[in-house]
């Protein structure tokens, strides 16, 4: 298809043979998009809206093309049909059975005008599991309620939420945001044998900022994630970016995260918790001085791979991309010194001496090696840098609570709600000035990360 063929508006195609809203599967990660379709002769155009002056795409109907009704095995897209060409089979669904049949009849009629309909066709690939409508509005119904025990990770994160004062206010927009996100998590019943959904939560030491994360198999997560991003107003360009990065990395596991604060901060995004070359992660980030510095530092210190890449889906730029990787080095001290060097190289203030001293003094009791770095970049500069220390001892956690003036009682209640385990990681992080947007604490902070648990396939 030539680009000039797309340079046509909806109005220029009038009178059309048929037009209206349909939802089409597209992208390398098979998400569903609502599009305004216009059938004109043997060309089926689709637009992002009915007022667009240029088409998003075009399905060219050929002599051997076909159209037929499809049965979605999960019965969640009842009125689905396919349009097949020599290059691809397009999966499309309508809102009603009548609409579906009228579209199919119109396409058949236009096909019959030149050689007639083909009843057969190419082999049809199986439809993926799609779980909710991708319309940019809040899903009032949400996921079907799970019958979960008090020990399930879903129950634990819900219980932990109730410990947080700013998440107990009934009219809270932040609470509503949390609920929309939690309803976007696929049900346990969607899991296939040998797969799982993992749950994580992190809190700043003063418990005024929290991060919630969940991840699982790509095939059951992707559509619910996209629906969540639509529902909270993420721009379509960033949903396209998710598809583009997903096509490059093709992760088996994907997930979503949300940040929130007592000052009304609400942010969300996606992440791929998979091992990939760091160069690939940097290519997925917005180019700029930070990515250049990170690339040079990583190369000089033999940092080759990362274990997670994520990105925010906020309504306005600059976009932020987080990369996490393990620090090389023969032991804890060598890795800690390398982390200190990273703070200096990336022009962050040094980790406060009292916090750093706790690590040096406890190096024999902390896990040998295993230190990780979290780097968040944007086109406008480094955003945040974090040093992640795995399996901190109770003594280390206690000392950090002391210097961070933590509310020990509230943290204890929070941990009890999560099942009684201590942090899986403690993070020393620094948020650069200007990136707190008045709702997140800028400067140095201590964050506790918890692995809440997993939903296993039944």
From Swiss-Prot:
GO biological-process terms attached to the record: endosome organization; receptor recycling; retrograde transport, endosome to Golgi
Coiled-coil residue windows: none
Signal peptide bounds: none
SMART domains assigned: PH
Ranges of Low complexity composition bias in the record: 143-154
Organism: Dictyostelium discoideum (Social amoeba)
Ranges of biased composition (kind: Polar residues): 124-142
Pfam families in alphabetical order: PH
Region entry Disordered, spans: 111-154
GO molecular-function terms, A-Z: phosphatidylinositol-3,4,5-trisphosphate binding
Protein name, per record: PH domain-containing protein DDB_G0274775
Domain PH: 15-112
GO CC field: cell leading edge; cytosol; early endosome; plasma membrane; recycling endosome; trans-Golgi network
InterPro entries linked: Boi1/Boi2-like, PH-like_dom_sf, PH_domain
The organism's place on the tree of life at top rank: Eukaryota
């Amino acid at each position: 298809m030539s680009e000039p063929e797309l340079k046509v508006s909806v109005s220029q195609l009038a009178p059309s043979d048929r037009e209206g809203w349909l939802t089409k599967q597209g992208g390398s990660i098979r998400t569903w998009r609502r599009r305004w379709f216009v059938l004109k002769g043997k060309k089926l155009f689709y637009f992002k809206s009915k007022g667009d002056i240029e088409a998003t795409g075009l399905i060219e109907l050929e002599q051997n093309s076909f159209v037929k009704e499809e049965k979605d095995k999960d019965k969640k897209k009842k009125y689905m049909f396919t349009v097949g060409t020599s290059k691809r089979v397009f999966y499309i669904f309508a809102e009603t059975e009548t609409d579906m049949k009228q579209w199919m009849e119109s396409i058949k009629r236009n096909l019959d005008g030149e050689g007639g309909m083909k009843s057969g066709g190419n082999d049809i690939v199986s439809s993926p599991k799609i779980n909710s409508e991708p319309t940019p509005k809040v899903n009032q119904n949400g996921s079907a309620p799970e019958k979960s025990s008090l020990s399930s990770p879903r129950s634990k994160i819900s219980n932990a939420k109730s410990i947080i004062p700013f998440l107990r206010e009934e009219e809270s927009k932040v609470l509503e945001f949390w609920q929309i996100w939690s309803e976007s998590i696929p049900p346990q019943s969607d899991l296939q044998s040998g797969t799982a959904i993992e749950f994580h939560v992190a809190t700043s030491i003063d418990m005024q900022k929290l991060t919630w994360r969940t991840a699982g198999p790509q095939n059951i997560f992707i559509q619910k994630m996209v629906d969540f991003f639509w529902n909270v107003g993420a721009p379509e360009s960033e949903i396209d970016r998710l598809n583009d990065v997903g096509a490059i990395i093709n992760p088996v596991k994907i997930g979503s995260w949300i940040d929130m604060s007592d000052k009304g901060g609400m942010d969300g995004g996606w992440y791929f918790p998979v091992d990939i070359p760091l160069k690939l992660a940097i290519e997925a980030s917005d180019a700029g001085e930070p990515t250049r510095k990170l690339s040079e530092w990583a190369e000089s210190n033999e940092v080759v791979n990362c274990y997670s890449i994520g990105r925010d889906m906020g309504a306005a730029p600059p976009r932020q991309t987080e990369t996490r990787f393990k620090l090389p080095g023969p032991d804890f001290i060598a890795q800690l010194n390398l982390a200190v060097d990273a703070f200096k190289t990336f022009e962050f203030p040094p980790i406060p001496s009292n916090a750093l001293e706790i690590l040096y003094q406890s190096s024999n009791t902390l896990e040998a090696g295993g230190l990780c770095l979290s780097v968040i970049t944007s086109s406008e500069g480094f955003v945040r840098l974090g040093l992640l220390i795995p399996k901190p001892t109770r003594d280390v956690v206690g000392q950090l609570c002391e210097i961070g003036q933590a509310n020990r009682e509230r943290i204890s209640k929070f941990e009890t709600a999560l099942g009684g385990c201590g942090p899986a990681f403690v993070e020393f992080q620094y948020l650069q000035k200007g990136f707190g947007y008045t709702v997140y604490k800028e400067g140095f902070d201590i964050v506790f990360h918890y692995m809440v648990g997993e939903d296993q396939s039944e």
